[in-house]
A protein has these predicted regions:
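Structured binding/interaction patches within domain cores
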Residues: 19-174
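Low-complexity intrinsically disordered segments
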Residues: 161-198
């Protein structure tokens, strides 16, 4: 049986799966901010609880992320703004439809950020090229995707597959490990680009 596409997995996920999927996308993009804090830790801690602690932990994460500064150039400022928007857009209500919309938006934003990093500082992709690549990724046909966006797509799929198995805290820990791997990759890319631009 063929694997499900990213769009299909998001459409079938429950509240916890959607919240964790969006959160994981956001976490993998954090190296684009020059911050040593872990603004999403409280949200990860509260995911197993579900609706009860979500609004308060979300507010705490927003406050922490608001103080994180981008690395200091125009491109980084744009990425930082997108990351903050991803968290600001998270719904306070623990309901499947708003969470699905948020998870979907986070998926697109994370893929877009990785696609722009694939292009490099001198090769900003056109809007039409970005749309084409993202559409292919989400529908299971990433034919023109670079290595970073391909790896991010693979992690998004893996996260949703883990969450679909419904293994509670064990599954959430597995998801965090996947996201930590993605963070390490992106942090190395950001560090390498910073050295080149000096």
């Amino acid at each position: 049986m063929a694997s499900k596409s990213l769009r299909e997995l998001i459409a079938q996920a429950d509240e916890r799966g959607l919240a964790a999927s969006g959160l994981a996308c956001l976490e993998r993009c954090l190296p684009l901010l020059a911050s040593e804090t872990d603004p999403l830790g409280p949200l990860w801690d509260g995911l197993a609880e579900g609706a009860e602690g979500w609004p308060g932990r979300l507010a705490e994460a927003r406050d922490t992320l608001a103080g994180a500064a981008p690395p200091g150039d125009g491109e980084a400022d744009g990425a930082a703004a997108l990351i903050r928007h991803m968290l600001d857009a998270a719904p306070d209500d623990w309901q499947v439809e708003p969470l699905r919309e948020w998870a979907d938006d986070c998926s697109v934003a994370a893929l877009e950020l990785h696609h722009r990093l694939d292009a490099g500082p001198a090769g900003e992709p056109t809007a039409s090229a970005v749309i084409e690549v993202l559409k292919g990724c989400r529908e299971g046909e990433p034919t023109h995707a670079g290595p970073l966006v391909t790896a991010e797509l693979r992690r998004q799929l893996r996260v949703l597959e883990i969450l679909a198995q419904g293994e509670g805290r064990i599954g959430l820990r597995q998801v965090q490990r996947v996201s930590t791997e993605g963070q390490r990759v992106l942090r190395a890319v950001v560090s390498r680009r910073a050295r080149v631009q000096r």
